[in-house]
Amino acid sequence: MKYPVLYEKSETGWGAYAPDLPGLGIAAKTLEEAKELIREAIAFHVEGIREHGESIPAPFATTEYITI
């Protein structure tokens, strides 16, 4: 499955979260680290869902850039 991920820069580093997986987010010092950590977090989260016999949520969020 393909989940959209949002990356946000802060004064101290980067945050990332997947809107389709509530409560799942990471913090990192660099964007590269954030990309690696969110990928690992999503995989771990989905694995946990499977282990509990629950259905994996289908991606539903979409993204768009709007020019003003």
Regions found by a protein language model. Give the residues of each.
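Short, charged, surface-exposed hinge/linker loops at domain edges
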Residues: 1-4, 36-68
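Short aromatic-glycine-(Arg/Gly/Cys) micro-motifs in beta-strand/loop hairpins
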Residues: 7-21
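Proline-rich low-complexity regions
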Residues: 19-22, 57-59
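A short, exposed loop/beta-hairpin motif centered on an aromatic-Gly-Thr core
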Residues: 22-31
